[in-house]
Amino acid sequence: MESIEQQLTELRTTLRHHEYLYHVMDAPEIPDAEYDRLMRELRELETKHPELITPDSPTQRVGAAPLAAFSQIRHEVPMLSLDNVFDEESFLAFNKRVQDRLKNNEKVTWCCELKLDGLAVSILYENGVLVSAATRGDGTTGEDITSNVRTIRAIPLKLHGENIPARLEVRGEVFLPQAGFEKINEDARRTGGKVFANPRNAAAGSLRQLDPRITAKRPLTFFCYGVGVLEGGELPDTHLGRLLQFKKWGLPVSDRVTLCESAEEVLAFYHKVEEDRPTLGFDIDGVVIKVNSLEQQEQLGFVARAPRWAVAFKFPAQEQMTFVRDVEFQVGRTGAITPVARLEPVHVAGVLVSNATLHNADEIERLGLRIGDKVVIRRAGDVIPQVVNVVLSERPEDTREVVFPTHCPVCGSDVERVEGEAVARCTGGLICGAQRKESLKHFVSRRAMDVDGMGDKIIDQLVEKEYVHTPADLFKLTAGKLTGLERMGPKSAQNVVNALEKAKETTFARFLYALGIREVGEATAAGLAAYFGTLEALEAASIEELQKVPDVGIVVASHVHNFFAEESNRNVISELLAEGVHWPAPIVINAEEIDSPFAGKTVVLTGSLSQMSRDDAKARLVELGAKVAGSVSKKTDLVIAGEAAGSKLAKAQELGIEVIDEAEMLRLLGS
């Protein structure tokens, strides 16, 4: 029994060490798959020896039966809110008030942090062990969410290091990264579950589950930003020093925390964070600025329910209210009909927004939207503005029902919605001017046939003047005909003709992608090209044969098969080949003949790579005999996870698929 106890202790210590490296230092030493293996080993041992399970074991993150309701926890030190400023002038006025209140013109340095858009929580550690956690609530009393907080892998169940206080209450923010938010909503749409309006609502909903097992399935994370109770120990006398100490004890702290020596440096920090905001991978709504010296904080004190030594400098709001003037319906290249709300223009996150997507008929029904309604609009990063909810309490009397069209608003063809699909489609195909335009724009795009200089406005004119009906017609254009277009001189026209001639030499994968087959993206097109090698073999493939290709299931296989079964599509392909479109003959190499760790494996790339582009990595992997797929499935052998890997990584972990990082990929590529 002694050796089992030792084994359990070693496993728990190892897992805590790797949790610290992953969540706090952002420098994992092992792939997630290895972490999962260690966790499984610990779980199996504890199952065999339940008497040896300890409350701080990493396996105990998912415990506790569902609660009937949350009990209350009274905060020993109130959780105060912060005053807000919204512009430079207001911040500079705050800075002056701080300077004026301090004695002897003391120099002030500022500790600046991200203002995370999540849920504030307090977590109490006694002798380094997590004993309770609570929401902010009203600042005096919060809800007991201990069981749920224990499921969050970023939060240590036990602190490590030296001089840990007997009682330490840390404050911080639980939040949901963007990739996790998208996966939760994607799963909800597929299963008919609740769709969240934004990551903050999703984080709050996940943390306030009565069943901790549900919380455990949500990819919540946490950053620490302050302290409440402190007994039986000491902390540094600066705010930054305290955060760095928390990090040493295993608590995650944002790596964007910055010490600023002046108000000018604070403003520079604010603008840099605002610029970086779309690429952070999680929502923030401003920066928090705190006097760094604890002695100066004490001198400044508090007013009402907020400290005088800190302020939240908010970004322009990402959500605003406005009215829906009308709902129009756009037709995409595959015939998908998308409702778009035409709005009373409103500034959201610094941008004037007059349109917002409504996705599909189900979304309109879910929102209960009527024309004339007052709505909340959200715009986050580069995401297309969307309607979050209807303000039903302020619904005008003259609102009108949104009627989804039964005929295409462009060509008049029937609209159909296949059972099981959320999207309604125009059945007109290429007789529909809208589908024709969007199909041609896709065909000439950079990642398809890459026709330089042929922009959307040129395509619009070519279709409207009926110069072009199919992609093959593009290669019949002359400089003379193009010169007749608006803002197209002889030189520009000749440049487009030259670009079309150059585009005739392509690759089989690009050609397939350019055809615009439903559900066939770049990765799937590359997989089809690599597997079949020739157009003739692909055209003759059955649905069963198509499903042998990595990343191709029954739905994609059916779309590909139906595309090539359609005579008009085969005719367009024949015309394109007759116009001189061509690609190099395939070089067939059996995976068995390649001495490579990737040979014969189906590989998925996720996240961003720092040492090479995604395209270069794909090309190198294919050279070494790999089949690169675009999504994770049971057919996947290996996932390569770069920075900010999202739902694909989560799916790989769920399926138990091997995961390696970029460094390991580079090592194997060089071996």
Curated annotation (Swiss-Prot):
One of its GO terms (cellular component) is cytosol. The active site is at 115 (n6-amp-lysine intermediate). It catalyses: NAD(+) + (deoxyribonucleotide)n-3'-hydroxyl + 5'-phospho-(deoxyribonucleotide)m = (deoxyribonucleotide)n+m + AMP + beta-nicotinamide D-nucleotide. The keyword rRNA processing does not apply. NAD(+) binds at residues 32-36, 81-82, 113, 136, 173, 290, 314. SUPFAM superfamilies: BRCT domain, DNA ligase/mRNA capping enzyme, catalytic domain, Nucleic acid-binding proteins, RuvA domain 2-like. GO terms for molecular function: DNA binding; DNA ligase (NAD+) activity; metal ion binding. Its cofactor is Mg(2+); Mn(2+). Keywords: DNA damage, DNA repair, DNA replication, Ligase, Magnesium, Manganese, Metal-binding, NAD, Zinc. Pfam families: BRCT (PF00533), DNA_ligase_aden (PF01653), DNA_ligase_OB (PF03120), DNA_ligase_ZBD (PF03119), HHH_2 (PF12826), HHH_5 (PF14520), Nlig-Ia (PF22745). DNA ligase that catalyzes the formation of phosphodiester linkages between 5'-phosphoryl and 3'-hydroxyl groups in double-stranded DNA using NAD as a coenzyme and as the energy source for the reaction. It is essential for DNA replication and repair of damaged DNA. Belongs to the NAD-dependent DNA ligase family. LigA subfamily. This is DNA ligase.
